[in-house]
Amino acid sequence: MKKNPKILLIGSGNIGGTLAHLISLKNLGDIVLFDVAEGIPQGKALDIMQANTLAGSDIKIKGTNDYKDIEGSDAIIITAGLPRKPGMSRDDLISVNTGIMKSVAENVKKYAPNAFVIVITNPLDVMVYVMLKESGLPHNKVIGMAGVLDSSRFNFFLAEEFKVSTNSVSSIVLGGHGDAMVPLARYSTVKGVPIPDLVKMGLSTNERIEKIIDRTRNGGGEIVALLKTGSAYYAPAASAVEMLESYLQDKRQILTCAAYLQGEYGVKDLYAGVPIIIGKNGVEKVIELQLTTNEQALFDKSVDGVRKLIEAVK
């Protein structure tokens, strides 16, 4: 990867602005902040660059409403679309956001066909599928931000339960980025000790872990209900930056993301949250976990929900 890659952020709302700030603080590359709303990306770019003078960052941020400015982007994060409001599911956004994603995909295909693309727009698993099909980019270069965020929420709740640092907790959440996602307690650990073993030690109960799993599934909705005017943006932005950094710096981290499946987990031609290795080529490998019959059934149910939504937009 070049020394100063060009990073494009499509959508300059709460997540887009937070992304620009985090990326500049990490000095990952120069940024183009795009939005259809005039003045918004330009104003946020100026504000963040002025803030960066206090953080010692000289990263350049260009705010624009012109798709021509995205030409030659090395990496793209897409947040454009309507956010959730109280009472809405991620799936309620499908009609409007599909149209937005198709327009974005056409311009990515035209101006940045070699970029690595991370989609955040909801409903995530459908939007990343639309991006792949409409842009014509290779599937290893188009992924969705889902499991990193869901796992971070699961990690936080587990750390609270066991009264430990979040740094000691590692978890995996599979499936679609929706209410049927599959947090896997069996593959989640506190400093290497699986959650079921900690339950056997009397440090928690199966009932309490199930409540945490349910809270993880509804983690986004909980924040939407509290904010009342939008959805989460700090954690989604931090999650996408983790993915971006692994690509730009060839870290080859194993992260749970919405990846295109070609037979893994018994699924073909669909995006779903699974562990993958992200390196300089994008998706380097899909990690196929050995699931129990019950875990596979839950995964299949989650994926079926994604499949039905995709059929609705075809």
Swiss-Prot record:
One biological process term in Gene Ontology: tricarboxylic acid cycle
Enzyme class: oxidoreductase
Active-site residues, record numbering mapped to chain: 177
Superkingdom of origin organism: Bacteria
Pfam family, one: Ldh_1_N
Annotated positions binding substrate: 84, 90, 122, 153
EC number in record: 1.1.1.37
Keyword terms of this UniProt record: NAD, Oxidoreductase, Tricarboxylic acid cycle
GO MF annotations in UniProt: L-lactate dehydrogenase activity; L-malate dehydrogenase (NAD+) activity
Catalysis performed (reactions): (S)-malate + NAD(+) = oxaloacetate + NADH + H(+)
Record InterPro entries: L-lactate/malate_DH, Lactate/malate_DH_C, Lactate/malate_DH_N, Lactate_DH/Glyco_Ohase_4_C, Malate_DH_type3, NAD(P)-bd_dom_sf
Zinc recorded as keyword: no
SUPFAM superfamilies: LDH C-terminal domain-like, NAD(P)-binding Rossmann-fold domains
Entry keyword ATP-binding: no
UniProt binding sites for NAD(+): 11-16, 35, 97, 120-122
Role played: Catalyzes the reversible oxidation of malate to oxaloacetate.
Family: Belongs to the LDH/MDH superfamily. MDH type 3 family.
PANTHER family, per the entry: L-2-HYDROXYCARBOXYLATE DEHYDROGENASE (NAD(P)(+)), L-LACTATE DEHYDROGENASE
Name of the protein this chain belongs to: Malate dehydrogenase
Taxonomic path: Bacteria, Pseudomonadati, Pseudomonadota, Alphaproteobacteria, Rickettsiales
The gene coding this protein: mdh
